[in-house]
Structures are given as structure tokens and as C-alpha cells.
Regions:
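Post-His helix in hydrolase/transferase enzymes
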Residues: 132-144
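Beta-strand-rich structural segments
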Residues: 164-172
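N-terminal non-catalytic accessory region
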Residues: 1-57, 61-84, 152-153, 172-403
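The feature captures the conserved acid-bearing segment of alpha/beta-hydrolase catalytic domains
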Residues: 77-133
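Beta-strand-rich domain onsets/edges
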Residues: 144, 148-164
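Generic structural signal for bulky hydrophobic/aromatic residues embedded
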Residues: 41, 143-147, 171
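A broad, low-specificity signal marking well-ordered, structured residues that form hydrophobic/aromatic
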Residues: 107, 120, 166, 182-184
């Protein structure tokens, strides 16, 4: 959206998505197994825009995927410029852009570690983190200038007033395969309680193997629920902060039937289960910049639960997804103890929090984030207290605070 805010049409931005469902698949991606699929994606983009070359930005494992792609002369010839975001690179003065001599696309490395480089052009963001280095305003500014030769006019996301078109995919995580056979319904909600404002959804989309849904016209600044109905399974409810601009790249990650995510989530008719995510690592032990993430529940039937800050040093600073539910060991009690399975997953952790719930919600759950400990610029989402026996809840906070 920052590119679009600076006149770089959103139609020119596309995502190449692939599976990371298990170590063998990850290792295959690292070793070049996706070069043909990436080439097909690039060919589609070139044909769509009647162009000869693309710019590509690749993050983390994606830098290995793109590095293998660029090692082929014919494929490298389709790339105008390449940005490597905190992934493959080296140390010292002799690192080079991927590819063969005479066929290398110009490259830019953006790294957290000030010792890492890739070729002659590098930007170091030592005060940022691995995921943040792909999404931050500073990273965007470096990418934009490298691709266009000009500094961006703004690093803010410029708000579009009124209705904007929103679309994307509903996919099984981490396979990135479409949630085939499900239905996505879109509701406008009360920002104070998460309650739906109408008896019928604004729109509804049948999800096929592509996972694609939309577009739907939504009002910037308004709050919405995206309800993914999964036949024979718990309904998955997605909530996020209000949209600021049109987007074709909204993703809803759900779990496949019988997945380890599903089997390790303790569910029941009297408590809620949710996942909180943000494309910025949660700082759990970083002095005054430690994040605060408080959860409270209003439940007339079961009793209110006071605000509890689930951020603890034991979580570690490298996570972007936090699973939250009442654990088996201490039912109806909030201890904040780590949920062992989720804490063992890369970029994820989990905490024991009792949030009273009901299949027919009797109240709501408030989740309040103070990014980097800044209590003057809080972010808040309020959602119905759906019981986990029949429902799952996912919340996405912005990785930025913008006045």
C-alpha cells in the first residue's frame, strides 16, 4: 500500500506464494525446486502488463528461491532489479548479486545484521527485526528508491476516503493452498463489541481451489468480520484493523482439517480460542520498547475477566503469531503459561488465557496492543466471545501506527 500511495499502481504488485508445509518442502524450496513455478508466475505478470522485465523483492527463504531463479541466464534476463530482504547473503567486501557474470540483475540487500551484504548496494536496519525489515517504512523507502531511482514522496499509507475494493485469498496455512469448499461471508460490525450490524452479510464468496475471494467494496475506517464457514468444522472468524486503501492481497490463513494446529488447540463450549498476529515481531523483553498485549473479556453469563498482559520474557522476541486459549492443565484459570506446541513453532508462541465464551456469544473479548510499549498510541480490537467448540478467532494488528 505504500507503493500505491506513491503512484506505483497496485495493479503492478503481485505475490508469488508457495508451501512451507514441512521441512522437506522447505529444503526443496531452498535448493531451487520452485524456479519453474516462479518463472511461470513472472511470465503471467509480463504478459498481463505487456512488459519485458519485472522488479522482484524476496524475503527470508524467498531470497534462496529467487537466488536460484537468477542463476539461470534466460530467467535472469526477465528481472530488471532484485531486492533481498534479510535472507541469503554473505559477509565481507566480495559478495555479489546472484547470477552469472554479465547476466546479473542489479540487486539491493536489506539486512538487520550490519555485517551481511549482497553485492555493492546494501541498507542495514540494526534496530529492526527479521519480519519488520520486510514491512517497515525504512525498508519500503530503500526498496522504492532502488526500483524507481527516486525517493518516495511519503512513507505513510495515504488513506483513500469512502469505499475501496478489497480482495485476496483464503488459504490453508502453511501450505498456501486454497481453502476449497469453504464460504467467506463479510459483515460490518460494531467496533466496540464486534456485534454484527445487519442480519445479512454484505457479501458472500464461494472459495475454490485457488482460494480467491472478492472484490468487495468496504469503507475505510470501518470495522468488519470475515466469517469463513468450513463445512463440518468450526467456523473461523477473522478480524483486523480498518482498511486504509484498496488491496488485492488480503490473506486469511486457516488450518486444514486434522492439522496439528487444530489438534493442539484446546477447545470447548465455555471458552474462546484465538490467534493474534502482526507482521512485526512482538518484543517481550526489550526495556521501554517491550510490547504490551492485554486481553479482557466481558461475559454476563460466566463473569468478566480482567485485563491480562500475555507478553512474557519466556516467549522470546522472534514471534509474530500468538495462540491464546485456556489450557488443559488449568481450566478456567489464566496463568499466562506457554502453550508448549505453539511455542515450539517458528515465529509462533502461545499463552494460557481463559476467555469465557459461548456458541451464541453473550459478550466480547477486548485485545489491546501498545506497540513497543507506547501506551499513548494503542491499537484495539473487540470481538464476540465465540466458544471454541464451534468457532475459531483470528486477529491481525497493523505493523505500524499511523496518526
Amino acid at each position: 500500500m505504500r507503493f500505491d500511495s506513491n503512484g506505483y499502481s497496485a495493479d503492478y504488485v503481485s505475490a508469488f506464494e508457495y508451501s512451507t508445509n514441512g521441512l522437506p518442502i522447505i529444503l526443496a524450496a531452498r535448493d531451487g525446486a520452485l524456479s519453474e513455478a516462479l518463472d511461470e508466475h513472472i511470465e503471467r505478470v509480463l504478459a498481463e502488463h505487456n512488459s519485458d522485465k519485472v522488479n522482484i523483492a524476496c524475503h527470508s527463504l524467498g531470497t534462496a528461491v529467487c537466488g536460484h531463479y537468477l542463476n539461470d541466464q534466460q530467467r535472469a534476463a526477465k528481472v530488471n532489479a532484485y531486492v533481498a530482504l534479510d535472507g541469503a547473503g554473505g559477509t565481507g567486501p566480495d559478495t555479489t548479486c546472484p547470477g552469472e557474470e554479465g547476466w546479473r540483475a542489479p540487486c539491493l540487500g536489506i539486512f538487520v545484521d550490519p555485517e551481511r551484504t549482497i553485492g555493492p548496494n546494501n541498507v542495514h536496519l540494526p534496530d529492526e527485526t527479521h519480519v519488520q525489515a520486510a514491512t517497515s517504512a525504512a525498508s519500503f523507502a530503500a526498496q522504492f528508491e532502488f526500483f524507481t531511482g527516486e525517493e518516495p514522496t511519503t512513507t505513510d499509507i495515504v488513506v483513500e476516503e469512502g469505499e475501496v475494493a478489497i480482495s485476496g485469498r483464503a488459504v490453508y496455512f502453511p501450505a498456501n493452498e486454497g481453502a476449497n469448499g469453504s464460504t467467506l461471508r463479510v459483515w460490518e460490525i460494531d467496533s466496540d463489541t464486534g456485534e454484527r450490524l445487519a442480519n445479512e452479510p454484505l457479501d458472500s464468496f464461494a472459495i475454490d481451489a485457488t482460494g480467491e475471494w472478492g472484490p468487495v467494496d468496504l469503507v475505510t475506517g470501518a470495522h468488519y468480520e470475515f466469517e469463513l464457514q468450513r463445512p463440518g468444522r468450526a467456523t473461523h472468524h477473522f478480524y483486523r484493523q480498518p482498511f486504509l486503501r484498496a488491496s488485492e492481497l488480503v490473506r486469511f490463513n486457516t488450518s486444514a482439517a486434522g492439522s496439528e494446529i487444530e489438534t493442539n488447540t484446546n477447545s470447548g463450549p465455555e471458552h474462546a480460542a484465538l490467534v493474534i498476529s502482526r507482521d512485526l515481531e512482538w518484543y517481550v523483553d526489550n526495556g521501554e520498547q517491550t510490547d504490551i498485549l492485554e486481553i479482557s473479556t466481558v461475559s454476563p453469563l460466566q463473569g468478566d475477566q480482567p485485563a491480562f498482559n500475555l507478553i512474557t520474557p519466556e516467549m522470546g522476541n522472534g514471534n509474530i503469531g500468538i495462540h491464546v486459549h485456556d489450557d488443559v492443565a488449568t481450566p478456567r484459570e489464566t496463568t499466562g503459561a506457554l502453550l508448549a506446541y505453539f511455542h515450539a513453532q517458528i515465529f509462533q508462541t502461545g499463552a494460557d488465557v481463559f476467555m469465557p465464551g459461548d456458541p451464541d456469544p453473550d459478550g466480547y473479548i477486548s485485545i489491546v496492543s501498545s506497540p513497543r510499549g507506547d501506551t499513548e498510541r494503542k491499537q484495539q480490537l473487540n470481538v464476540p466471545n465465540w466458544a471454541s467448540s464451534e468457532h475459531r478467532i483470528s486477529l491481525t494488528f497493523n505493523d505500524f501506527v499511523q496518526d
